[in-house]
Amino acid sequence: MRLTKMRFPARRMALAAATLGLVVAGSGFTAQAAEAPSSTPVPINPPDGTVMSYVVNAAQANPGQTRKVELAVTASGGVVVQSWPAIGVVIAQSDRAAFRENVKTVGKTSILSVGATRTAEVGDKITGVQLPWGPGASGWNKGKNKPVNGDEPTTLVPAGPADSQESQQWDMAQINADKAHAITDGSRSVLVGVLDSGIDPTHVDLAANISVADSVNCTQGGRPSQAAGGWYPTTSDHGTHVAGTIAGVRNGVGIVGVAPNVRMASVKVVNDDGYIYPEYAICGFMWAGQRGMDVTNNSYYIDPFEFWCDDQPDQAAVRDAVSRAVNYSVSKGVVSAAAAGNSGVDFNTNTTDSASPNDAPAPIQRTINAGCKDIPTQLPGVVTVSSITQAGQLSSFSNRGLGHIDVAAPGSRILSTTLNGKYGLKSGTSMASPHVAGVLALMKSAHPELTPAQMVAKLRADATKTPCSAAQNNSGATCDGTTELNSYYGYGVVDALKAVK
C-alpha cells in the first residue's frame, strides 16, 4: 500500500452494472490517443522456482467459467489461492516462469487476461488445499509501528484524565459534524468497512463500535480469514487512527468520530511489511459486498505501483480485477471513499512516477500517460477525497486534478485514536478520506433508502462550494476550474449537516 501513500502506501461514481454475470471485457479502459507516449515497461520475469502471485480473469463472470479458470491454473502448475466466481477472478500462486503463458494456452477462451500482482517473490505463500471459495487460515505477529505511504508519523497527544478532547477536533466543526450530531449520531444498522491495517479492539473509543462478526484478515495471499486476532493491527496504527475519525465512540473520553453510533468492521488489507497488494484489496471489496456493508474507507494506494498502466499487460489485468471487485461492491450497495494520495501531483498533468515498483530493490523513473491510474482512488465506483488544512487550503501534499477530485475534507494534523489506548495527530489524505466515509455513514443512517449513486450525488450537491485559492505553501500545480467544480476541492468541502437533512 503505501497507505496513502499509507506506507500505507486514494472515480467517478459511474456505477458498475448491477448485474455481475456479465462479459467483463466491458471493464476495459479508454484507448490512448495515437500520439500519447507509451508508459515505461516494468518487466516481471521471475526464474523458475520463484513463487509469484497472479490474477487470472475469466472472460465471463460466472461460476462455470471461473471453474474452467481454476482448472487451467492447476494444470499450469499453479495453486488456486482464492476464487471469486461472482466477478470471474481467480487469485493464483505459481513458481513456474511460464505460468502466465501456459495458463492462457490451457484456459483458451475462458481466460481474458493474466497479470502478476507484484514484482517481488511472494512471502505469504499458500501451500495447503483450499475449499472452493472458502476462507483459509491465517495468523498475525506483533511488530513495530511503521509509517505509511507518505502520511506523516503519528505525533502522540497526552490524554487528560477522562477528559473529552472534542474541543481540539477542529476538523469536526469544519465539516459541520458537530451540528449534524444534534440530529443523529448514526444508526447501529449502518456498517462501515475500514480497509486498512487493522483496528485496535481494546481502545475505549473504538471497542463498542467494532463488529467482530464482520471483521476479517485479507493479507494471507488474498484469502479471507476470520481466525481470532487476524484483523488486529500488528505493525501500524494507521487503521486505528482512521477508525477513530469515522466512528469514535461518544463516551465523554478522548475524541468523537463523524458517525459515533455506527458500527465498523476491521478489514485488514495491509501486511506486516506495510504493503497492500491487489489480491488483498480485491478480498476487501468482495468481503464488503458479501457482508452487506454500507460504506468502505480506503486510505491507501495499491502496491507495488503508485500508477497502474493499461498499456502494460500485467498492470492492466490487475486493474481489471480490482475494478471488478469495486463494481461488485457497488452492485451490493456499498459506497467507497478513498484518499487521493500524498504525492502532490495533478492527475491531469502528471507524466512521471518515481515511486514504483515499491517492492523492488529500488523503484525506477517511469514515464506514465493518461492510461495510468492511481487505484483504487481513480477507479469508477470510488469517491476521491483531497485534503485541506484547518485554514481551508489544499494541503501541500494532496493530489489534485479537475474531474478527478470529488470532495475535500480535513487531513492535516488530525487528532484521533492510536494504539494502546492513546491519541495522536496524523496528516495525509488518509486522514481526509475517513471524514467522508463518516459523512456517508451519517447520510445512510438518515436516508437508508438511498442507493450508492444517489448517495454520491447528494454528497456532491451538499458539499460547500469552495473557489480556487493558493495551496498550502503555494505547493504543486495551481487550482483549475470554477467555484462549483475545481481541481483542489472537487464539488466542495464535505458537509455532514446537509448529509443528514
Predicted feature residues:
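Secretory targeting and sorting signals
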Residues: 1-35
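C-terminal region of N-terminal signal peptides and the immediate post-cleavage residues
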Residues: 24-47, 252
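Autoinhibitory propeptides
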Residues: 36, 42-43, 60-63, 67-166
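C-terminal subdomain of the subtilisin-like protease fold in secreted/lumenal serine endopeptidases
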Residues: 40-47, 81, 293-300, 447-501
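Active-site core segment of subtilase-fold serine proteases
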Residues: 140-143, 147-263, 283, 289-318, ...
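Substrate-binding/access-modulating region of protease and related hydrolase catalytic domains
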Residues: 187, 269-376, 419-434, 485-486
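Active-site alpha-helical elements of protease catalytic centers
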Residues: 188-191, 195, 224-268, 277, ...
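Extracellular S/T/G-rich loop segment that most often corresponds to the catalytic His/Ser-adjacent loop
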Residues: 334, 359-445, 449, 457, ...
